[in-house]
Amino acid sequence: NCISTIDTVSSGHIYLENEDITEIKEENIAKFRRENLGFIFQDFNLLDTLTIEENIALILTINKVPEKEIDKKTLEIARKLGIEEILNKYPYQVSGGQKQRCASARAIVNNPKIILADEPTGSLDSKAARQLLEIMEDMNNKMKATILMVTHDPLSASYAKKILFLKDGKIFNKIEKGEKQRKDFYNEILDVLALLGG
């Protein structure tokens, strides 16, 4: 919550590209969030009165991106996530997995510096989950976006470069992927989970 600027820190500082985000003035926080952060929530937070396309494009519209560029970026991300066929539908007309892909598209359409993801694959089938994780991995590798993901799913975690395991509110263990293959890293995650007792 502190990184997202929803809560303020009681002590210390948080830096994003040498900018102390704890010092951002209240009137500039919304602009900071729009330009730097992408959020993928467990509950999709889609606007029911907007189409899927309008939900995805919302952040670009707020940021006054030219309409042609909005159309291009929205269609491009929708294709990557396999939801281009439902762009004209409303959230109540699509499945839970399609809503999650829409929410994910909205979070990443503006290439944020940080993506905060809370169980992003929770309501997706395995194919859609893999597509989303690969897109997030691509954003991390090619666009240098930092992704902070909370997950209980070892497969989702295996897409990360670094994992912190929490137990009773404290860091229990930390592992890094390094040069390991995903399968080997996945098995290492399972070993740590066994130590954690779940």
How would you name each of these model-derived features?
Residues 170-194:
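Conserved beta-strand-loop-alpha-helix hinge in the C-terminal portion
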Residues 12-20:
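Conserved ABC transporter NBD signature motif
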Residues 90-94, 98-100:
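Conserved ABC ATPase signature
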Residues 109-113:
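A short, proline-enriched helix->beta-strand linker immediately N-terminal to the Walker B motif
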Residues 50-58:
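Short coil-to-helix segment of the ABC ATPase nucleotide-binding domain corresponding to the Q-loop/switch region
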Residues 104:
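Hydrophobic anchor residue at the start of the ABC signature
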Residues 115-118:
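Catalytic Walker B motif of ABC-type/P-loop ATPase nucleotide-binding domains
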